[in-house]
């Protein structure tokens, strides 16, 4: 009986998608670092490629990027999208083992914003009080059995 490699039911990416996504991320980061893209905005902006998610057929690479500094993320994404075919050609030699070179799609990486929102929420006095109260209760529960064992 053949084993099913469908990961849609589990909600996760396959090992192959993760591996290829990381290879594409590394190759894309090298192209950006070397400054091979002739665009004023891209040349003067440091761009972080935080993740690349591959489609199940490995034909689409969704690249999550964060421009560092004061650059507008949407403008950077638009500039990268306009050079997507050029980027695809520059990344190709690093990914020669792939049967098909993926189409690049660029999206803003909002995970840093989400982390800062969560951090801000955790710093509220009410939340800090509740967290310290939970720690006190946990510590007290751990102490009681040890005293009873002696």
Swiss-Prot record:
Biological role: One of several proteins that assist in the late maturation steps of the functional core of the 30S ribosomal subunit. Associates with free 30S ribosomal subunits (but not with 30S subunits that are part of 70S ribosomes or polysomes). Required for efficient processing of 16S rRNA. May interact with the 5'-terminal helix region of 16S rRNA.
One term of GO molecular function: ribosomal small subunit binding
Record key words, sorted: Cytoplasm, Ribosome biogenesis
GO cellular component entries: cytosol
InterPro entries, per database record: KH_dom-like_a/b, RbfA, RbfA_dom_sf, Ribosome-bd_factorA_CS
Biological-process GO terms, alphabetical: maturation of SSU-rRNA
Location in the cell: Cytoplasm
Assembly behavior: Monomer. Binds 30S ribosomal subunits, but not 50S ribosomal subunits or 70S ribosomes.
Segments for region (Disordered): 131-150
SUPFAM superfamilies, per the entry: Ribosome-binding factor A, RbfA
Disulphide-bridged cysteine pairs: none
Taxonomic source organism: Brucella melitensis biotype 2 (strain ATCC 23457)
Top-level taxonomic group: Bacteria
Name of the protein described by the UniProt record: Ribosome-binding factor A
Gene that produces this protein: rbfA
């Amino acid at each position: 009986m053949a084993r099913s490699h469908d990961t849609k039911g589990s909600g996760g990416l396959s090992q192959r998608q993760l591996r290829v996504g990381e290879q594409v991320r590394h190759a894309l980061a090298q192209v950006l670092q070397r400054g091979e893209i002739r665009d004023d905005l891209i040349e003067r902006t440091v761009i972080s490629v935080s993740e690349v998610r591959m489609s199940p057929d490995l034909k689409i690479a969704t690249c999550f990027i964060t421009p560092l500094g004061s650059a507008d993320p949407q403008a950077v994404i638009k500039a990268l999208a306009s050079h997507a075919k050029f980027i695809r050609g520059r990344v190709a030699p690093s990914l020669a083992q792939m049967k098909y070179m993926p189409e690049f799609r660029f999206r803003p990486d909002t995970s840093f914003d989400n982390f800062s929102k969560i951090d801000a929420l955790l710093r509220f006095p009410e939340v800090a009080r509740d967290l310290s109260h939970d720690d006190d209760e946990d510590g007290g529960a751990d102490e009681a059995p040890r005293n009873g064992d002696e």
